Amino acid sequence: NLIQFGNMIQCANKGSRPSLDYADYGCYCGWGGSGTPVDELDRCCQVHDNCYEQAGKKGCFPKLTLYSWKCTGNVPTCNSKPGCKSFVCACDAAAAKCFAKAPYKKENYNIDTKKRCK
């Protein structure tokens, strides 16, 4: 679920940036998404959005699905049984790892999406 996703982000980025910093970033980080991603981090969010969309098509509710995972050496690892829990966990873990690798550009936080996300 979204709280677990926030915790995964903290795991992967070693707590270096609050999870909420990603909630209003670029064109895809946060609710909804459209246009061309503004950078690598925003692309991580676009991929995550697409993953959640696929989960929804499988009958899952990714924002609410509780799953089992652990943080080992700043790597989020899923240990849920196959099905919605495993699928959603994999979406979140991949995004958290992607976030940890991508540079965070302050100028892409809280942008005017109407102008920049076409």
From Swiss-Prot:
Classification via CDD domains: PLA2c (cd00125)
Location relative to the cell: Secreted
Calcium keyword on record: yes
Disulfide-linked positions: C11-C71, C27-C117, C29-C45, C44-C98, C51-C91, C60-C84, C78-C89
Positions annotated to bind Ca(2+): Y28, G30, G32, D49
EC main group: hydrolase
Molecular-function annotations in GO: calcium ion binding; calcium-dependent phospholipase A2 activity; phospholipid binding
EC number: 3.1.1.4
Active site: H48, D92
GO biological process: arachidonate secretion; lipid catabolic process; phospholipid metabolic process
Required cofactor names: Ca(2+)
UniProt-listed Pfam families: Phospholip_A2_1 (PF00068)
Keywords of this entry: Calcium, Disulfide bond, Hydrolase, Lipid degradation, Lipid metabolism, Metal-binding, Secreted
UniProt cofactor note: Binds 1 Ca(2+) ion.
Stated role: PLA2 catalyzes the calcium-dependent hydrolysis of the 2-acyl groups in 3-sn-phosphoglycerides.
Family under the similarity heading: Belongs to the phospholipase A2 family. Group I subfamily. D49 sub-subfamily.
Record protein name field: Basic phospholipase A2 PA-11
Organism field: Pseudechis australis
